């Protein structure tokens, strides 16, 4: 079921996806304005890739694996249950992270400067409060990226070509997420470099999630467990797409740009799957 030769590749892809938060941080550090039209298309593209591959490839593959271990009826029930369990997991995590500390609440480069300018510079209490908020933001994105790392890792472990596509989609998703984390960190410190560093390092939780998941689950990595994990990965990615990527794409740009990105992502994913038939 699992080719150990794929482990390093899977881990490398997950590391690439996680550290893409640093790209978002760099944008917040160097850019003078946010290209919202590009972000709208990019986020829509990422959502299109995730939704298409989840329903067309991952969900089907999870069912096929489970069907080899039990009856077709039970395999269908297990696949559906694991799919919604994955969605529920990421929904609970999202619910537990409040308002501004949530890295899925999108912000822009311009907002960093406006927000900092509005802060009272000589209030020690506000400085402490904002520093605490910045730390919370770093912790929040770490929590969010943990299951995403496991998703990218498990996909690459099963099928390297599929893993590459998912890692790229998650990396695109992590770019504006890194920008969002940089905002409260910058509020707390007034230091763009520190905002970049904190946000960049918070992405490390993605490969850590992959590593922990692999170490913990490896002794139990039977076909049944793998099938359940794969179905839950599909649920996680569909939830991220519908709850976070698509609304953010709409917020950043025009509706038609978002839809263009979605179908472009689906088309690229469909073509890549056809080429590997």
From Swiss-Prot:
UniProtKB keywords: Cell inner membrane, Cell membrane, Ion transport, Iron, Membrane, Metal-binding, Plasmid, Transmembrane, Transmembrane helix, Transport, Zinc, Zinc transport
Ligand binding (Zn(2+)): 148, 173, 177
One annotated GO molecular function: metal ion binding
Matches recorded under Pfam families: Zip (PF02535)
Protein name stated in the entry: Zinc transporter ZupT
Annotated positions binding Fe(2+): 145, 148, 174, 177, 206
Family: Belongs to the ZIP transporter (TC 2.A.5) family. ZupT subfamily.
Record keyword DNA damage present: no
Locations listed in the record: Cell inner membrane
Domain of life: Bacteria
Transmembrane segments: 7-27, 38-58, 73-93, 133-155, 165-187, 196-216, 220-240, 257-277
């Amino acid at each position: 079921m699992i080719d150990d030769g794929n482990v390093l590749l899977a881990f490398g892809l997950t590391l690439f996806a996680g550290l893409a938060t640093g790209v978002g941080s760099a944008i917040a550090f160097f850019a003078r304005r946010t290209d919202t039209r590009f972000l709208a298309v990019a986020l829509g593209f990422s959502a299109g890739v995730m939704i298409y591959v989840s329903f067309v490839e991952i969900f089907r593959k999870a069912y096929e694996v489970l069907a080899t271990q039990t009856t077709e009826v039970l395999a269908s029930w297990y696949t559906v249950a694991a799919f919604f369990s994955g969605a529920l997991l990421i929904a609970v995590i999202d619910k537990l992270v409040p308002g501004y500390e949530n890295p899925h609440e999108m912000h822009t480069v311009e907002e960093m400067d406006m927000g900092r300018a509005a802060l009272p510079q000589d209030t020690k209490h506000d400085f402490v409060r904002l520093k605490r908020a910045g730390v919370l933001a770093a912790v929040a994105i770490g929590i969010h990226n943990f299951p995403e790392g496991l998703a990218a890792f498990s996909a690459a472990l099963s099928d390297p070509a599929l893993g590459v596509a998912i890692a790229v989609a998650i990396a695109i998703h992590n770019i504006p997420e890194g920008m969002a984390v940089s905002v409260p960190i910058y509020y707390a410190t007034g230091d763009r470099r520190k905002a970049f560093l904190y946000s960049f390092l918070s992405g490390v939780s993605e490969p850590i999630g992959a590593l922990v998941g692999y170490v913990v689950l490896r002794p139990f990595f039977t076909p049944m467990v793998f099938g359940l994990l794969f179905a839950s990965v599909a649920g996680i990615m569909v939830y991220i797409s519908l709850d976070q990527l698509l609304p953010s794409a709409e917020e950043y740009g025009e509706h038609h740009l978002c839809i263009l990105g979605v179908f472009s992502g689906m088309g690229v994913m469909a073509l890549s799957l056809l080429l590997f038939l």
